[in-house]
Design a protein with these regions (language model features):
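Phosphate-binding site recognition
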Residues: 1-368, 383-386
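Conserved catalytic cores of phosphodiester-cleaving nucleases, focusing on short active-site segments
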Residues: 2, 376, 400-404, 413-421, ...
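Active-site metal-binding core of divalent-cation-utilizing nuclease and nuclease-like domains
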Residues: 87-93, 383-410
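Structural motif
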Residues: 96-98, 413-417, 449
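Metal-dependent nuclease catalytic cores in nucleic-acid-processing enzymes
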Residues: 128-135, 286-294, 377-382, 431-451
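Mg2+/Mn2+-dependent nuclease catalytic core
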Residues: 118-124, 421-438
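Domain-level recognition of nuclease-like catalytic cores that cleave nucleotide substrates
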Residues: 440, 446-471
Length: 471
């Protein structure tokens, strides 16, 4: 769209007529008024190796420029910055260039500084955009990608750009995904319900905007007419796994809490915007924010898994990762735990939770009911397929610890889990009745399963009591 807007040779002048930009006072001043250089770095990555890719970027672009502007006399026809300036100075009525670099960081992500390619590439960009030629050559430059521009020490390598990222989106926050209004409009157009898309693809909090959707997945879901995980990278679980296997202090604990639906604090400023320089838990979480696997709340400085699509990728990563055996086992056995819960097999439920707790004590330490809730959220992970799992569900006279609400087309009963620490399962059940938690589930036909779970710190055993009542 940027290319079509700026490029002086674009033919379609009606493309923007029904869009907001057409009403801007500066629209006509810039519309299709510039020669545009468009580079897709993924194209170069597929054609060249790390040894000479930077040289080929220059030579390929220069060769094409010579074909378009054959009458220019060049002082140095091997330097792209000089070639561009020569064209601007010598071509009659020549406007400055607009340059668009798509997937600017593909080289950094693909080659990971193989043969020193990172530094060569950054040097090329600095030569283009920070040289004395830059102001005379370019009317504007746009670079899109996953990562912000690489830092050297604490400064950006190209500090004359306005940078907008998942962590610092500035006024561009609306442009990082689809808004809820846009998705509702698309759902109406494609005759598909809004709620499933909200569950699967919503949840990104970008800047102050709450409720941003993954646009690619939304469009594929609308085309296919069903929701699933549609990450463009079919090896998405490998990407997550490569970072969560890093053995930084506190990382495994945070990943478990993220899987359980909790938010985790993160300090994003230390990351150097370099995938080869990941030095801490905070760097890992920051990378996952930039890659779209985590949503970032700048006010609380916390991150969380945004939606069901990403949660599925996290789960796949952990199940396939050997270093996460005990957590993977808990996830794999969670279907049986749910079945035992619905069948009122309280002893089986208590024993299963004993095993999960024992296996995970090196990762998560029990110290209160919230820690117990975190482990139980993992223990009941399979329930997310048929249930909406809500922590601290507002109901009756307080908040139930965990509630499983049946999804549409699920015929199973709702489940209320009340957790106690060093008390009793009877006390947990009594609180469900006293606080009238089940009354808030009157919209769900059939039974409601009431589950009281207590952890005894002295015996390190769990006690479970299960009752059923009509909603």
């Amino acid at each position: 769209m940027l290319y079509a807007y700026y490029d002086q040779w674009s033919a379609d002048r009606n493309l923007f007529s029904d869009l907001q930009i057409a009403s801007s006072s500066s629209f006509s001043r810039h519309f299709q008024n510039y020669p545009v250089l468009y580079l897709d770095m993924t194209d170069f990555v597929t054609r060249y190796d790390s040894v000479n890719i930077v040289e080929h970027i220059q030579s390929d672009v220069i060769s094409e420029l010579k074909e378009v502007f054959p009458n220019i006399q060049h002082r140095n026809d091997r330097d792209l910055s000089d070639v561009l300036l020569d064209i601007v100075l010598q071509e009659p009525r020549q406007e400055k260039f607009i340059m668009i670099i798509d997937e600017w960081d593909a080289i950094l992500r693909e080659f990971k500084n193989e043969n020193g390619v990172d530094d060569k590439y950054i040097k090329l960009l600095r030569g283009l955009f920070k040289s004395t030629n830059a102001m005379s050559t370019f009317a504007g430059v746009y670079m899109t990608g996953i990562l912000p521009i690489k830092k050297y020490n604490t400064q950006s390598a190209l500090n004359n750009f306005h940078e907008y990222s998942m962590v610092q989106p500035g006024p561009m926050a609306d442009c990082f995904g689809f808004t809820s209004d846009e998705v509702r409009s698309l759902c109406a157009k494609h005759h598909m319900g809004y709620e499933p898309l909200e569950e699967w693809y919503d949840g990104y909090q970008i800047g102050g905007k709450v409720g941003m959707f993954n646009p690619t997945s939304v469009m594929i879901a609308l085309y296919n007419q069903y929701c699933d995980t549609y990450w463009a990278n079919s090896g998405a679980y490998d990407t997550v796994a490569s970072y969560i296997r890093m053995n930084f202090e506190g990382l495994k604990d945070d990943v478990i809490r993220l899987l359980a639906g909790e938010a985790c604090p993160v300090e994003t400023s230390s990351f150097q915007n370099d995938l080869n320089v990941v030095r801490s838990k905070d760097d890992v979480l920051t990378v996952l924010i930039h890659l779209g696997y985590l949503s970032y709340d700048r006010n609380s400085r916390t991150c969380r898994i945004p939606n069901r699509e990403v949660a599925t990728e996290f789960k796949n990563s952990i199940v396939s990762e050997t270093g996460w055996g005990v957590v993977a086992t808990a996830i794999n056995q969670s279907e049986q735990l749910l079945a035992d819960t619905l069948a009122s097999k309280s002893n089986s439920v208590a024993k299963a939770i004993d095993v999960i707790h024992s296996d995970n004590t090196s990762v998560l330490q029990y110290n209160d009911e919230n820690s117990l809730a975190c482990v139980l959220t993992i223990a009941y992970y399979a329930a997310k397929k048929d249930y909406l799992m809500i922590r601290e569900f507002p109901s009756g006279k307080g908040f139930a610890d965990i509630v499983l609400l049946p999804r549409p087309n699920c015929t199973q009963p709702a489940v209320v889990l009340e957790l106690k620490y060093d008390k009793s399962a009877d006390t947990a059940i009594e609180q469900i009745y006293d606080k009238r938690y089940a009354g808030s589930l009157s919209d769900f036909a059939g039974e409601v399963v009431l589950v009281g779970i207590n952890y005894d710190k002295a015996t390190k055993q769990h006690e479970c009591k299960i009752e059923k009542l009509k909603a």
